[in-house]
Amino acid sequence: MWIVAGVCSGVAILLSFYLIYKHLRNYTNPELQKYIVRILIMVPIYSVDSWLSLRFVELSLYFDVVRDTYEAYVLYCFFSLIVAYIERDFDLVELLHSKEPLPHPFPLTCLPKIKLDRGFLTNCKRFVLQFVFIKPIVAIISLVLETQHKYGEGKFQVGTGYVWLTVVENISVGLSLYFLVLYYKAMEEELKPFKPLGKFLCIKSILFFSFWQSIAISFLVYFGVISPIGSWSVDNISSALQDFITCVEMVILAICHHFFFNYQEFRDPHKVPFIYDKTTKTFFNNPKTNITPIIKNFFTNVTNISDVISDTRETFILPLLSPDHHHNHPTTKKKDEESNLLEPEDKDIII
């Protein structure tokens, strides 16, 4: 089984590395492509992690911490990608202020409509970003509980850590996806040229399948469908089964990435690729097409997580230190004053 999984992982990694190379070779829009490359890296990470977990099943929980952490990071990268796409052509806050209040999607249509302003954007960032922290924390707690034999993977019993951590993770990812959908609905018209739906389904599919696969396998364990075989315990078999399925799925996802995250839209004969200068934190045109700038772009721009730190500071730390931070922001203050002057008072539409 692990040999078949290894072949699938190898194919998925080769397909992904080729697409990553092509994006870095045609790095004409760094602000978008850095997020795209980060998303594409998900396939190699998942493939290697799942194969290692399958090959060394006793250590699978340790390997999964890396995979779970990157899974949450990819969701944040997709949100940042569609924000960056809008900011390329519009002042995002001004655009939000020009729109009508947004109704909640079904089945929450009974809730008050959402006023679109900087506060809405901050809330979207906050709820997407919280998953980036909750997911690895849940993974680490799972690891600690497993070492104490209190995790009980696949056991739907109140006394096991598995049940409670699954609930916490489900709530966290649900909120993250919900606010991602809210932003998408608010910007649906402006995002149409970017064709975000296929890209979003690529991201959501891995979150959906990885989570519900584990739940489905846990039910199989609970009802006795999966039983011990030789030296392999039920936990070993259920973990190996999920890792094997993931290795196969990565081939499909890597192929989908070639359609939905294609580099061709960034291939412009009238533009030369950019290269990132870490010292000045700016991009400059790079007339060369050798491997050096490709490596440089990857290690100095794609792997630079300063945007995560900045968003964390903006959405979590500053509001705690200064509750009036949002209202004191110059753009927000100006827009709020304009809204008070130009818009009729309607308390039901603000949340």
Curated annotation (Swiss-Prot):
| Recorded superkingdom | Eukaryota
Membrane is among the record's keywords: yes
Enumerate the subcellular locations listed in this protein's record, separating them with semicolons.
Cell membrane
Q: Which SMART domains match?
A: Solute_trans_a
- Per UniProt, the ranges with Acidic residues bias are 339-351
| Annotated region (Disordered), positions in chain | 327-351
Q: Which residues are glycosylated?
A: 26, 236, 301, 304
Pfam families to which the protein is assigned, alphabetical: Solute_trans_a
Q: What does this protein do?
A: Probable transporter.
Family that this chain belongs to = Belongs to the TMEM184 family.
Q: What is this protein called?
A: Transmembrane protein 184 homolog DDB_G0279555
* Organism whose genome encodes this protein: Dictyostelium discoideum (Social amoeba)
